[in-house]
UniProtKB/Swiss-Prot annotation:
It comes from Drosophila melanogaster. It comes from the Eukaryota. Glycans are attached at residue 636. Disulfide bonds: none annotated. It is found in: Cytoplasmic vesicle membrane. Changing residue 298 to N: In crr; 89% decrease in drosopterin (eye red pigment) levels and 81% decrease in xanthommatin (eye brown pigment) levels. The gene is w. InterPro entries: AAA+_ATPase, ABC2_TM, ABC_transporter-like_ATP-bd, ABC_transporter-like_CS, ABCG_dom, ABCG_transporters, P-loop_NTPase, Pigment_permease/Abcg. This is Protein white. One of its GO terms (molecular function) is ATP hydrolysis activity. It holds the Pfam family ABC_tran. GO terms for biological process: aminergic neurotransmitter loading into synaptic vesicle; biogenic amine biosynthetic process; cGMP transport; compound eye pigmentation; eye pigment metabolic process; eye pigment precursor transport; gravitaxis; guanine transport. One of its GO terms (cellular component) is cytoplasmic vesicle membrane. Keywords: ATP-binding, Cytoplasmic vesicle, Glycoprotein, Membrane, Nucleotide-binding, Pigment, Translocase, Transmembrane, Transmembrane helix, Transport. May form a heterodimer with bw/brown. May form a heterodimer with st/scarlet.
Amino acid sequence: MGQEDQELLIRGGSKHPSAEHLNNGDSGAASQSCINQGFGQAKNYGTLLPPSPPEDSGSGSGQLAENLTYAWHNMDIFGAVNQPGSGWRQLVNRTRGLFCNERHIPAPRKHLLKNVCGVAYPGELLAVMGSSGAGKTTLLNALAFRSPQGIQVSPSGMRLLNGQPVDAKEMQARCAYVQQDDLFIGSLTAREHLIFQAMVRMPRHLTYRQRVARVDQVIQELSLSKCQHTIIGVPGRVKGLSGGERKRLAFASEALTDPPLLICDEPTSGLDSFTAHSVVQVLKKLSQKGKTVILTIHQPSSELFELFDKILLMAEGRVAFLGTPSEAVDFFSYVGAQCPTNYNPADFYVQVLAVVPGREIESRDRIAKICDNFAISKVARDMEQLLATKNLEKPLEQPENGYTYKATWFMQFRAVLWRSWLSVLKEPLLVKVRLIQTTMVAILIGLIFLGQQLTQVGVMNINGAIFLFLTNMTFQNVFATINVFTSELPVFMREARSRLYRCDTYFLGKTIAELPLFLTVPLVFTAIAYPMIGLRAGVLHFFNCLALVTLVANVSTSFGYLISCASSSTSMALSVGPPVIIPFLLFGGFFLNSGSVPVYLKWLSYLSWFRYANEGLLINQWADVEPGEISCTSSNTTCPSSGKVILETLNFSAADLPLDYVGLAILIVSFRVLAYLALRLRARRKE
């Protein structure tokens, strides 16, 4: 097909005589009358009859074995329009609404989907096609009850399973939604990922052996045997599974429960033609087992196009066609857009239904005519009648229980703890790099402050080294926590929205799994730096120092959790963290004497873990230093006569050591509770 032919087809023209019916604006009523008459009397492009019932494949997954016909009717979807300064304007409008008696003006909305209808039967593979911006993903999100914030489905829209209205909870029990972007914990292997999914997805009455057996079965069915022990990896950072293997792994996660309805958004995105064909073949096999499979796809190859049982073409948020691929050829030929011989029909349909830059008015007029012609066709009228009467094909079976989550609280906690522990052991950034970094910094500080003596200069150096203990533990743990925790938050958000586990089980399992690491790091650091610097000798003094440094490490880790949960991205968390830490650092007693803190900022000093830890470490170092132990070698400088004098100079008291321990413990609990609340609030906003 030449360039001239392509441009002619994109404009809406054709070398076939029938094309004039679509694009000749002067023919007007006569052309429209001919099209309407053809659709109303003889033509039936697209059928609503379901395919022949497939054989029951059976499954040991514990999922309901039922065939589902999914229909949707009158789906109007609106989206909020982003305007410059809209967040500030919204805040101002809300404030004025509280204090002023002004009429509320609703925010502008964009009509994303317009009266979209459709139906998908068990045993068939339905492909939703269209150009970018046609509304494919918006439709799938609405069908799966996963519409993001700012997207509103009109109350008049109906979603029916076997003729019965369905809500989000019922859909969740029967539908698996594979989204376009694959989110995994990259340090796990494919098999470990599926075992975790089986522990939280499958019904609670199944034993562990039954779950593992189902994992093995799914691995065989989706051809994942060769890569089941390969780590998933992180694209662009850690090498792992290929794109096709990652996509099949996403299907396997959903197929564990053998759901009767499978919705996939762009399953071939970013894949080569061979891999894309293998992925669609997997979906085809699933549909042949009696499942209802709906997917979106941009421009499939001719081989892929032949695998589809039915196609739903969308343009400008409207339905342009619904039927079999062969019926689509007849439909577009009849409305005057005949697909040329030896040309991929999928490419042709996307070109015809696309808005061409520079020809927007002409393109939208062509699209409107095609959509209007389908709306008055016999298949559209039959579908309207079918959905309006809500004919029951087969009553919905009731779920096996009324539980919101498939797994019990303890099963969820054990699964999350197991996965988090594996990721801690396998994540090089979290373990190997941290331990190497800790060792190198401890040796460096030890060499700089090597063998300090109890002199005027030694006192100052020891105080500085102790404060470096705190700053190193703080920044190292805060940034490490932010980098790792925020990278897993998208996985948590998706899994929490899918009701795989509770927010509290995730947070508790995650923090407990990382606890051994945050105990090991301060131990390694203190064991190296403490004797090299020559801090106060004695086992009790060493373990007091170790306990305080460990508490600081866990306070800073808790603070890192809080910043991560309250931030929308890793970059934002890394930007917010240092400015928030600096005020706490200033109140630590090293840069600013504790007695010099302004009264109006006194409350902030009680939130500083630097203050409690610095006071505790200095008490541990100087409290029992008797007069005469400090050598005064310089006569022209003030020399502290004892450790008590040093503490009094800094406005610290040896009697406050227990309070320092309590203060650090309270900060650990407080920061983690606030982090959990922020995480829970964030998860609820996504629901």
